Every structure is written in C-alpha cells, then in structure tokens.
A protein has these predicted regions:
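Catalytic-pocket segment enriched in acidic/His residues
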Residues: 87, 121-123, 130
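Intrinsically disordered, low-complexity Ser/Thr- and acidic-rich flexible linkers and loops
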Residues: 102-111
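Acidic/glycine-rich phosphate/pyrophosphate-binding loops and surrounding catalytic core
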Residues: 1-76, 80, 92-93, 97, ...
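Short secondary-structure boundary segments
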Residues: 85, 120, 141
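Short hydrophobic/aromatic patches at helix-to-coil boundaries
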Residues: 154-156
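Extended hydrophobic secondary-structure segments
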Residues: 80-88
C-alpha cells in the first residue's frame, strides 16, 4: 500500500524509522494473495507449483482469509502464513492449532518453522496481539497514516 512512484522512498523511510519491510517487491518472496488463490487451482496446488518453479531460497507466504485456508497452507508446505484481517478471538484459537499442526502433521511438506503473521494491525489495537503467539505483524499504518510535506519544484 505504497504511493505509486514513491515505493522505494517510502520503504526506505520505514526502514530508517526502525521498521522491517515485508517485501520490497514481488521478487523477494512468493506471496499467494486472495486473487492468486481464486484464480489458481487452490492453495495446495499453487504451493506445489511454486516449490517446483522458484529457487529454493525464496520463501512462500500465503495470505489466509479463513482458518481452513491457513491450515491448508501449513499442510501444503508454506513457509509463512499471513492471517488476513481475522478477529483477535480467531487468531488466539488458530495460532496454537497451526503450531500443533507443524508438530503432528504426517505431510512431508510441513515447515517445522512456520512464521505466523497477522494483518489489520494499527496503533489502536496493537496491544491486543501481544500474547497471541504470532511472530510478526503486518501494518500499512506507517505509510497510510503518515503526513506528507506538500512540496513542489518550479523552473523558470
């Protein structure tokens, strides 16, 4: 959620402020978002295709909108799952289930070090997520809530 044409500057400013950028571009990691999942043959098949086409050094992250999507992503071998706009109650219940799944699944694809991330975080609800067991938060607040200086350059 960056300003067109200013992405690299906004990402750099965020980094200078102490933030860790999720990705600088689509080539940093494979991220399956809702449109990819809807367009494709599903999460499991998409992960299978990605594992056979991208370098093994690239991570595969799935943006899950439901608990069943998150579980499917873990079973299929995603390196990370972003729990997209889920309620705090759902997250508190789901995170331990996903952690348990990495220990008990018979799937040979399950990553034992799955990274669980949540979105929908802002300064007003950040403290609600402290004891949920998540690894990362994803927020666009530093970009979308920032005040910009109105400047221009004129030539004569």
């Amino acid at each position: 959620k960056t300003t067109p044409g200013l992405r690299i500057f906004e990402k750099y400013a965020f980094h200078c402020g102490g933030g860790i950028n999720h990705r600088l571009g689509l080539d940093d990691a494979a991220m399956l978002k809702e449109n990819h999942i809807e367009w494709s043959q599903g999460i499991s098949e998409s992960i299978k295709i990605l594992k056979n086409t991208i370098p093994w050094t690239k991570k595969i992250i799935v943006e899950a909108e439901t608990p069943s999507q998150a579980k499917e992503a873990v079973e299929a071998g995603a390196d990370g799952v972003l729990l997209d706009e889920m309620s705090i109650q759902t997250i508190k219940k789901l995170v331990p289930e996903l952690r348990q799944l990495t220990k008990t699944s018979s799937s040979k694809y399950v990553s034992k070090n799955i990274v669980i991330e949540v979105s929908g975080i802002n300064p007003n609800n950040l403290s609600d997520y402290i004891d949920t067991g998540i690894d990362l938060i994803s927020t666009s607040a530093p970009i979308t809530k920032s005040k910009w200086i109105d400047f221009s350059m004129r030539f004569s």
